[in-house]
Structures are given as structure tokens and as C-alpha cells.
């Protein structure tokens, strides 16, 4: 599989927000395309997907942090908007941020024991593991998800 040459630029576009989330003490993990990149398969992604704990205090911290990002389109969101339903809340700013409280029917606590971390500045950014990305993407019919699954399987095989 040929990696995308723009992967480093992709990560740096999102780094400021991810560092702000980590510095704010928000309980979250990066998922989907950016997590694939963080796990070692460079490819392009245009958005950030995060899985957050739906604890009320965590959601308040998240919304406070987002109120200082971009044009503050997240200001209209309230903790009550984050229901335990499938799907994401999308915040559109410099790039799209998709916020999930469940992925594949599972909460962040389900994925927590296998979370991995990448260092950005002086903070560690949590992200989903290759095995969990495979779990979430394996039944998808999208070509990019099939490529991600193959890449994550390759990474797991290399890790032994």
C-alpha cells in the first residue's frame, strides 16, 4: 500500500485542536482516518473524528474548549445534545470535527484498555488501536475503509 505524501501536513492541521483538547483534560480518543495515520499508515484525511466520554462534566469541558476554536460554531451545542445514539455531531470550522459518544455501539470505556498515544508537543493524544479500527471498519463497503483495514492488519502483523 502506497502512503499518501500529505500525511504529515494532515496531522499538523489538526494538532492545535487536539493539543487543546488534551490540555483541557477532556476524556477523548482520536478515531477513524487520523487514528489510522497515528497508528503508522500515512494517508490523507480531511476531518477529525473523536470519541468522547459522555459524562456531563467531560462534555462541559469539551464545549468550553471548542468555544475557543475557530469561529465558535460549537457555542450553540449543549451537553444534552450528546445522546447515546449512533452518529456524530459535526462541528464545521477550519476543518470538520465529528464528535461521537458511541462508535460501533461502544463507548470510550470499551476502547480505553487498548488506546494508544502519540506525543504532540508536551501532551499525549489518545487514539484507537489498529485492532479497534479493524473492529469498527471491517464491515464497511467504502474503499477507503477497506484500505484502512488492510493497513491496520499489516501493522498488527508487523507488531507480532
Label every model-predicted segment.
Residues 1-160:
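Compositionally biased terminal segments of proteins
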Amino acid at each position: 500500500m502506497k502512503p499518501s505524501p500529505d500525511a504529515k501536513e494532515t496531522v499538523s492541521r489538526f494538532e492545535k485542536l487536539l493539543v487543546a483538547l488534551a490540555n483541557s483534560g477532556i476524556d477523548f480518543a482520536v478515531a477513524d482516518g487520523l487514528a489510522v495515520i497515528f497508528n503508522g499508515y500515512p494517508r490523507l484525511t480531511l476531518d477529525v473524528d473523536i470519541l468522547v466520554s459522555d459524562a456531563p462534566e467531560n462534555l462541559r469541558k469539551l464545549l468550553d474548549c471548542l468555544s475557543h476554536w475557530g469561529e465558535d460554531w460549537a457555542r450553540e451545542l449543549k451537553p444534552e445534545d450528546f445522546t447515546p445514539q449512533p452518529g456524530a455531531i459535526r462541528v464545521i470550522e477550519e476543518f470538520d470535527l465529528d464528535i461521537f459518544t458511541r462508535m460501533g455501539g461502544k463507548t470510550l470505556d470499551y476502547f480505553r484498555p487498548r488506546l494508544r498515544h502519540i506525543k504532540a508537543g508536551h501532551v499525549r493524544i489518545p487514539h484507537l488501536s489498529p485492532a479497534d479500527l479493524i473492529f469498527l471498519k471491517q464491515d464497511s463497503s467504502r474503499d477507503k475503509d477497506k484500505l484502512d483495514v488492510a493497513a491496520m492488519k499489516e501493522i498488527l502483523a508487523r507488531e507480532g
